[in-house]
Amino acid sequence: MKLWLVRHAQPLVDAGVCYGRLDVAADPAATRASAQALAQALPLHAALHTSPLQRCEHLAQSLCALRPDLASKTDDRLAEMDFGSWEGQRWDALGAHALDAWTQDFAHHPPGGGESVNHVMQRVAQALDSTRNSGQDTVWVTHAGVIRATRLLLAGQRQVQHAHEWPTEAVPFGAWEVHGLSR
């Protein structure tokens, strides 16, 4: 059984803006290109789960249009991290005090009053456990934060204590990585 972790295409948002749970669209041409490439790579009848945010839903819809054997199911657990009042703000305008408060208690501090990293880890772990129990090849159309959390979970790490533990490398926009899963 395999899990495809697919990141949405390039969002239509200015560089340097925090847009975790902000429901911004992705570039339509890049979304179509990603769907076309992915449609050729996926096995028949894989389960397709998508974040409820439009930048992921549009990719899943484009993929289903190319692959009638796939049916998209929205899963709120695959949404990007909620940055609360930071959403839509420039990272460099948040101020050192706000960023320091988050990094000093990375596991539990909800940035901008949104969602803590360990809350993200818990909900992604629930989604991963459900996928494992399904016994079916599965595709997640999701976000960089969810993919990073999944990498940690697959490595056996169910919680993050410090900011330096959080992976910095991200799957490129519109790309994916594949992981083998066991029950």
Protein language model features and the residues they cover:
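Acidic, low-complexity terminal tails and accessory targeting/binding regions
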Residues: 1-2, 40, 81-92, 152-183
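Active-site-proximal alpha-helix that buttresses catalytic centers in soluble enzyme cores
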Residues: 2-67
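Generic beta-sheet signal
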Residues: 3-4, 46, 136-145
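Short, active-site-adjacent cap segments at secondary-structure transitions
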Residues: 12, 55-57, 80-81, 146-149
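Glycine-rich phosphate-binding loop signature in dinucleotide/nucleotide-binding domains
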Residues: 41-44, 131-137
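Short beta-strand scaffold positions
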Residues: 50-51, 122, 141-142
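Active-site catalytic microenvironments for nucleophilic, acid-base chemistry
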Residues: 62-66, 130, 153-157
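Phosphate-handling substructures
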Residues: 66-123
